[in-house]
UniProtKB/Swiss-Prot annotation:
Localization (cell): Nucleus
Keywords, alphabetical: Acetylation, Coiled coil, Nucleus, Transcription, Transcription regulation
Modified residues (N-acetylmethionine): M1
Species of provenance: Arabidopsis thaliana (Mouse-ear cress)
The organism's taxonomic lineage, starting at the top: Eukaryota, Viridiplantae, Streptophyta, Embryophyta, Tracheophyta
Protein name as catalogued: Mediator of RNA polymerase II transcription subunit 8
Length: 524
């Protein structure tokens, strides 16, 4: 028991710092400053403890002043330690519960075990090929390897510097400009960019310079019949052109009167085989078509006339007189032919309605007309409501039809023509019908597809004496009234147009007075 050593183990030898480093660090003064700082912090904590016990309000101004002094002193101490701490202060890679408390004050003159392990592994890897050589040879080999690494670093730095110069990296002016394009092309691109920028920002229209415009000299086939190109290369509508020949004006007026749709590339054109499209306000109109009615066409014509008048006011006076004379002559020719072509099929349509209503025997001949008559059935639907013919058609019912087709004439000629058409006797009307050209009537009758044993009637006088009105029985009286009403309507409408072509003197004021007297003597 006595032989057992009861002496404590020898105390570990205290590790001393390098004397030079210790002198530079000046640990004595640093220790004094740290102790005074600790006392100041302890005094502040005691003051807070006293405030908490006595439940008194602390003087925050004094406390903040003391805190600022303590904070400044601590900052000064840390800055002094930092100057020499790089030589012996080591920050470990891992922090655990054991060394967490001593990390702020860990001072050592040697590396931590994990850092020593990494250094040993790197050293062995570096000396792996030269360990068997003597020490001087190892030093030379290591120096040669260091020189090679330094040369590689210099080459890499040179390449990086050249690259920065070429692309302007790290400079204020940015990358250098690439080889520029042609000056003319660059100016065009800049001008186009400016126009687009103005159009987007200010809403200005893009105006191309004359050298970049594409002047259209020819139209596609489906637009050649509708649009007209003038000498300046601009596309104008037919109604806006002032120099239109008689044939072009006749084609435009025929399209407006008949209601025929213009040719389109998406579908075939049936100008001579099908009847016109129905109007948008017609009883037979559907949602698939939206052809404007005569009222809308009249409004469009009035708007175009106003535009033409404004253009005429800008021309010299002698040119205005010449253009006005040409337009009046073209309007008379086109209107006479257009009205004659548009009214006769309407009468034929009413003729077919009378036949369909008063068929009584199976052996009677039938004349089936083609069903789609959109442009003419508007007249039929308004005058003959629902296919039922009114037995006594008064003059007041015929006036709207006459007014609708005579609206395009001027005021004096319109009233004179209408009064002469109302008061002319039957003996004068029927001979005038023979003066109308039968060539315009035959193709229209061919469109309506006359079938059966009846020959094609090319004249209105043959229609009045047709055998389908010779029905016997109880319908004789009604057929006679229908014949009279149709004769009266045809005489009043077609006779008025015949007077336009053959007897223009009937439009004088004295004829208007005679017609007015005849209307008062023979009231309907």
């Amino acid at each position: 028991m006595e032989t057992q050593p009861q002496q404590p183990p020898p105390p570990p030898v205290a590790e001393k710092l390098n004397p030079k480093l210790e002198k530079e660090l000046n640990l004595e003064s640093l220790k004094t400053r740290a102790v005074s700082l600790a006392k100041a912090i302890a005094r502040i904590l005691e003051d807070f403890d006293a405030y908490g016990r006595t439940n008194t309000t602390p003087k925050w101004q004094d406390i903040l002043g003391q805190y600022s002094m303590v904070n400044l002193e601590l900052f000064n101490i840390v800055e002094e330690v930092k100057r020499v701490s790089n030589a012996f202060v080591v920050l470990p890679k891992n922090v655990n519960a054991m060394n967490a408390a001593i990390l702020p004050v860990m001072l050592s003159s040697k590396l931590l075990p994990e850092m020593e392990t990494d250094d040993n592994a790197k050293r062995e890897q570096l000396l792996q090929g030269v360990q068997s050589l003597p020490i001087p040879m190892q030093i030379e080999r290591l120096k040669a390897r260091m020189d090679m690494i330094a040369a590689a670093c210099e080459n890499a730095e040179r390449v990086l510097a050249d690259t920065r110069k070429a692309y302007g990296f790290g400079t204020r002016q940015g990358p250098s400009m690439l080889p520029t394009m042609d000056k003319g092309q660059a100016a065009k691109i800049q001008e186009q960019e400016k126009m687009l920028r103005d159009a987007v920002n200010d809403g200005k229209g893009t105006q191309l310079p004359p050298d970049q415009r594409q002047i259209t000299t020819a139209l596609p086939p489906h637009l050649a019949d509708v649009l007209i190109i003038n000498d300046a290369g601009k596309i104008a509508l037919p109604g806006q052109s002032n120099n239109i020949n008689n044939q072009g004006m006749m084609q435009v007026s025929g399209t407006q009167f008949v209601g025929r749709s213009a040719a389109s590339p998406s579908g075939p054109n049936f100008d001579n085989t099908t009847s016109p499209l129905p109007y948008s306000n017609s009883p037979r109109a559907t949602g698939m078509v939206n052809v404007p009615s005569p009222q809308h066409q009249i409004q469009q014509q009035q708007f175009q006339q106003q535009q033409q008048r404004s253009k005429l006011m800008q021309l010299p006076q002698h040119q205005q007189q010449q253009l006005l004379a040409q337009q009046q002559q073209q309007l008379r020719q086109s209107s006479m032919q257009g009205l004659g072509q548009s009214q006769i099929p309407a009468l034929h349509d009413m003729h077919g309605q009378a036949q369909q209503k008063f068929q009584t025997s199976h052996g009677q001949h039938q004349m089936p007309y083609s069903q789609p008559m959109g442009a003419h059935q508007q007249f039929q639907a308004r005058q003959l409501s629902g296919g039922h013919i009114q037995h006594s058609m008064s003059q007041g019912q015929l006036n709207p039809a006459m007014n609708r087709h005579l609206n395009q004439f001027s005021g004096g000629a319109n009233s004179a023509l209408f009064t002469s058409a109302q008061g002319s006797p039957s003996s004068q009307m029927i001979p005038n019908m023979s003066s109308m050209q039968s060539q315009t009537l035959v193709p229209r009758m061919q469109q309506f597809g006359v079938s059966g044993t009846n020959p094609q009637r090319s004249h209105s006088s043959q229609m009045l004496g047709d055998q389908m009105f010779n029905t016997s029985g109880m319908m004789q009286t009604q057929q006679t009234q229908i014949q009279q009403s149709q004769q009266q309507q045809q005489q009043q409408q077609q006779g008025g147009y015949g007077n336009m072509q053959t007897n223009q003197q009937s439009l004088q004021p004295n004829n208007m007075m005679q017609n007015a007297q005849q209307r008062h003597q023979n009231p309907q």
